[in-house]
Amino acid sequence: MRKPCPPRAPLQHLTVHQPVGLIVVEFATRRRLRINGTLSDTGSDRLRIDVEQAYGNCPQYIQNRQLHTAPASARSAEPVRHGHTLTQDDIDLVRRADTFLIGTTHPTRGNDASHRGGPPGFVRVEDGQLWWPDYWGNNMFNTLGNLQADPAAALLFCDFTTGHTLHLSGQATLEWTGTGIPGDDDRTGRRVHFTPEQLVAGRLLSLQADSVTAAPDNPPLTD
């Protein structure tokens, strides 16, 4: 897998023989594929992964986007920012997001990556922390199961218009709330709270989408 990226981007610091969880999302067709394995080789422009699991997931909550390479005029040489506290720009990016990716881990079964989507505003930001309602899905519970075993998690938000990205790492916990309360958008009675500990922000996305069609199964916001 090719991985051209700035010197201080997170992918530059991976070491071999560690477990890896990937997700590949084709937004134009609303398809996704999860790949888990072990990192066997890394260089300045590539990753090699020994695949142990690969399986598709349903198209629920994937927004339809036609991605294309951003023109040079839309790209920025602004520096990558590392920090521990969300800025207002970070909060605004999260609040307008309709998509994010989440990485979780298990003490003995490796790492996993998954997709979360919903209407803009489905991820709430309060007092420097994030939370979002869990939606009905395919009942595999890979992400929630991992969080029960290990609360470490990483989130990636992308602005497909500006190219800005926000990578957060921290701790996530599952909360059972009871159904029907404000913010329980899909009436599952559960939500995930996330406390950021480190962040990497920049204009790292080389792809753009000029328009978006919302997933037909997005539930409305209830708060």
Where are these regions (language model features)?
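Binding-site signature for planar aromatic cofactors or substrates
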Residues: M1-D223
